[in-house]
């Protein structure tokens, strides 16, 4: 028991020694703080004594977060799909951080819907997701980078296991693959400025990313707007099984979202942040192996998850 106690003490000592100094003086800007990962991360960083600048999409989300935390947290409304909103947020952050710059930019804002079989979706469905998850992330980063460079700080980008292997149709996985590519490219470029870039690739966690209306209602809407010939080619049984499989996946989602926010926090406060974080057992044991298997093997495994269409050959 004494040996275990000593090892535990040494681990905590090393962990604390590897932290960035003067965290209480450093500013962190986080997008998507209404709920989920962004909301919990903002609270964790306030508890650490950091100065948190939290961007929310709704007034209600901003007010509740402000009420529940201390003076060290300030909120602003931000729509990452609108350039003017991003410009206003950038000026606000610049006014807050002054000459010391921005220690960490956390691009967390994201949406999951519309998603489904690609043929069931429209161009607008793809654009809606990509504009938030990828284009918005890129534009926020480009506006904030001068302040991050000044602080020799961090960029932490929220991707997904779906950014390593495409598990569902629609703009979600496409946008997350784009986040991976953008993050890899800026990491190499910003290395020379002393800026570190980390990518968070969670598995399946329970958040509000699928919106308020519910998955079944979303899938029914996609199905009912399809042309009759497309519905016939898939069949009602395909729709039912596909929807049930998605619902089962969501029901199995891990509610312990602190696994994700702890990874995000480590990327911000550690002197040696990782390039990639993979919170969640499914991320480590399922999605990462699927991403590394030969493509025909991955296709075979994932195709078993999809129902057979009525007109299959």
UniProtKB/Swiss-Prot annotation:
Modification type Phosphoserine: residues = 185
Chief place where the protein resides: cytoplasm
Name of one Pfam family that matches: adh_short
GO molecular-function term, one example from the UniProt record: all-trans-retinol dehydrogenase (NAD+) activity
Reaction equations catalysed? a N-[omega-(9R,10R)-epoxy-(13R)-hydroxy-(11E)-octadecenoyloxy]acyl-beta-D-glucosyl-(1<->1)-sphing-4E-enine + NAD(+) = a N-[omega-(9R,10R)-epoxy-13-oxo-(11E)-octadecenoyloxy]acyl-beta-D-glucosyl-(1<->1)-sphing-4E-enine + NADH + H(+); a N-[omega-(9R,10R)-epoxy-(13R)-hydroxy-(11E)-octadecenoyloxy]-acylsphing-4E-enine + NAD(+) = a N-[omega-(9R,10R)-epoxy-13-oxo-(11E)-octadecenoyloxy]-acylsphing-4E-enine + NADH + H(+)
Alphabetic keyword roster:
Cytoplasm, NADP, Oxidoreductase, Phosphoprotein
The GO biological-process annotations, alphabetized, read as:
retinol metabolic process; steroid metabolic process
Tell where it localizes: Cytoplasm
Q: What is its EC number?
A: 1.1.1.-
The record's active-site residues are: 172 (proton acceptor)
Highest taxon of the source? Eukaryota
Give binding positions for NADP(+).
29-53
Record-level GO cellular component terms = cytoplasm; intracellular membrane-bounded organelle
- Which InterPro entries does the UniProt record give? NAD(P)-bd_dom_sf (IPR036291), Sc_DH/Rdtase_CS (IPR020904), SDR_fam (IPR002347)
Q: Which residues bind substrate?
A: 160
The record's similarity note reads:
Belongs to the short-chain dehydrogenases/reductases (SDR) family.
> Function, please?
Plays a crucial role in the formation of the epidermal permeability barrier. Catalyzes the NAD+-dependent dehydrogenation of the linoleate 9,10-trans-epoxy-11E-13-alcohol esterified in omega-O-acylceramides (such as in N-[omega-(9R,10R)-epoxy-(13R)-hydroxy-(11E)-octadecenoyloxy]-acylsphing-4E-enine) to the corresponding 13-ketone, the reactive moiety required for binding of epidermal ceramides to proteins. Displays weak conversion of all-trans-retinal to all-trans-retinol in the presence of NADH. Has apparently no steroid dehydrogenase activity.
Q: What is the designated name of this protein?
A: Short-chain dehydrogenase/reductase family 9C member 7
What would be the name of the gene that encodes this protein? SDR9C7
């Amino acid at each position: 028991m004494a040996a275990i106690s000593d090892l535990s003490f040494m681990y905590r000592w090393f962990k604390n020694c590897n932290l960035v100094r003067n965290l209480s003086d450093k500013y962190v800007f986080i997008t998507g703080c209404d709920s989920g990962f962004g909301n919990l991360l903002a609270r964790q960083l306030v508890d650490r004594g950091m100065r948190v600048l939290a961007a929310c999409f709704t007034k209600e989300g901003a007010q509740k977060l402000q009420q529940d935390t201390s003076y060290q947290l300030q909120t602003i409304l931000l729509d990452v799909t609108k350039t003017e909103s991003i410009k206003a947020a950038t000026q606000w952050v610049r006014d807050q951080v002054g000459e010391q710059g921005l220690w960490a930019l956390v691009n967390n804002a994201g949406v999951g819907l519309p998603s489904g079989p690609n043929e069931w979706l429209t161009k607008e469905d793809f654009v809606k997701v990509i504009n938030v998850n990828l284009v918005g992330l890129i534009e926020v980063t480009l506006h904030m980078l001068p302040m991050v460079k000044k602080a020799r700080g961090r960029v932490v980008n929220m991707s997904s296991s779906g950014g390593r292997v495409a598990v569902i149709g629609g703009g979600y996985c496409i946008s997350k693959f784009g986040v991976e590519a953008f993050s890899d490219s800026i990491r190499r470029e910003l290395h020379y400025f002393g800026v570190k870039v980390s990518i968070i690739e969670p598995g399946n966690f329970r958040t509000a990313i699928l919106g308020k209306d519910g998955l079944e209602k979303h899938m029914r809407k996609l199905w009912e707007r399809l042309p009759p010939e497309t519905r016939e080619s898939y069949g009602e049984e395909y729709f039912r099984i596909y929807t049930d499989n998605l619902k089962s996946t969501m029901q199995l989602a891990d509610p312990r979202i602190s696994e994700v926010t702890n990874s995000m926090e480590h990327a911000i406060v550690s002197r040696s942040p990782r390039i990639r974080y993979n919170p969640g057992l499914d991320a480590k044991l399922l999605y990462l192996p699927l991403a590394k298997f030969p493509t025909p093997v991955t296709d075979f495994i994932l195709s078993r998850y999809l129902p057979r269409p009525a007109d299959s050959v």
